[in-house]
Amino acid sequence: SNTALTYEGCLYRLALGAGIQVHTHTNGDEATEMVLETLAPALRDVPSPNHRFTLQHCQLADAAQFRKMKELNMCVNLFANHHFYWGDEHYRLTVGPERALRMNACRTALETGVPMAIHSDAPVTPLGPFFTAWSAVNRLTASGRTQGEHEKIGVEAALYAITLGAAYTLHLDDEIGSIEVGKKA
């Protein structure tokens, strides 16, 4: 609604002006679109090239939305465990095959150049970054079916996403996320 866009737009402008990073929870493509449409004018009013506003979950974003994220210098934190725990149900019942196959589009994020982290959404699924990385690499459902072969990422990319990629989305990459002199272990 226009009220939601106005409210979100005011929040984004205030945050940009104060140098406060915002992480916005979006599941569906409509929620993602609302954020993109709201952040674009806010950034025109309050330019901030290193804002690193991040979409959390962002499960059903399509390729065009990832391109918009890139244009807006946004980050994404995708719920990689989702396929294992609910992939079969999403494929069969809730969003259908086409959307289920492109959910949590890690490869699209990487190929588009959108800085990416991946997460487990603990306590929704168990906290375990290596399982989260495994989920992004393999995209297996609980039944053993591969869901979205084209969105698989490599092991190195998955490890980056749970370490320095995650730190980057939090503006903490100068403090954590990699083993370097001066960083916290």
Region spans (language model):
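Active-site gating/metal-coordination segments in enzymes
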Residues: S1-Y7, C58
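His/Asp/Glu-enriched, well-ordered alpha-helical/loop segment
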Residues: R13-V22, E30-F53, H57, A63, ...
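Ligand-binding beta-strand-loop-alpha-helix segment within the catalytic cores
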Residues: C75
